[in-house]
Design a protein with these regions (language model features):
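Flexible, solvent-exposed loop/hinge segments and secondary-structure transition points
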Residues: 2-211
């Protein structure tokens, strides 16, 4: 009987120590992941808004913004785009330079219509509506196809452009708001374009377009 109790206590102690060890490892790993995600986000902020010194979160009526965004989609975009549209605004921040002067807005947006399921990116937009650029926080597309969305040849098409909305084309882009789709990856091209347009419409809403 004593041996059974002893063995039970030993087993309990081992289980307890193992559980505490796993919990500690999880917490350390979780903290490490959180730090890496924050680092990636800050790097993205600086990429899409050169000269960034500080930033503040922007509070806005997300319900009213969503209504406004959908109105703009219905007004500006094709029936095919409207039916597939599945983008959401995750975060909006106001960007300032090191002297405290306003630079514009940085929007984090997720689009759930990518070939790999979803993509998340940041978009830098100046106060006058000029898109400064995009940077991906997560992108799980097909290597050699949709992953080319990270290539400069594709991403640079969105830089320093002031347009009401973007659209992709499978032929040569001619208008200012047209971008060349990634060859054999129009689903990814569509997801990126829709996510970016969502960000443009959101900034327009915040700066007075929705009033």
């Amino acid at each position: 009987m004593k041996n059974i109790i002893k063995d039970t206590l030993i087993l309990f102690a081992i289980t307890l120590v193992a559980g505490l060890g796993l919990g500690l490892v999880y917490n350390v790993t979780a903290n490490s992941r959180a730090m890496q995600e924050e680092k990636t986000k800050i790097e993205a902020y600086n990429t899409v808004m050169p000269g960034l010194g500080s930033f503040d979160n922007v509070s806005f009526d997300s319900v009213a913004a969503d209504i406004y965004i959908k109105e703009q989609i219905n007004k500006n975009e094709t029936e095919k785009t409207i039916k597939s549209y599945n983008a959401t605004i995750d975060e909006v921040i106001k960007a300032k330079d090191k002297s405290g002067n306003d630079l514009g807005y940085i929007i984090t947006v997720t689009d759930n219509e990518a070939y790999g399921g979803s993509l998340q990116m940041t978009v830098g937009i100046k106060d006058d509506g000029t898109v400064m650029g995009i940077s991906f926080l997560s992108l799980s597309e097909t290597p050699g196809l949709g992953m080319k969305a990270k290539d400069d040849d594709f991403m640079s098409q969105f830089s320093n452009k002031k347009v009401d909305f973007f659209k992709y084309t499978k032929s040569e882009a001619k208008a200012d708001n047209e971008i060349n789709a990634i060859s054999s990856a129009t689903i990814t091209s569509n997801a990126v374009t829709n996510g970016l347009n969502c960000a443009i419409y959101c900034v327009d809403f915040i700066t007075g377009g929705g009033k």
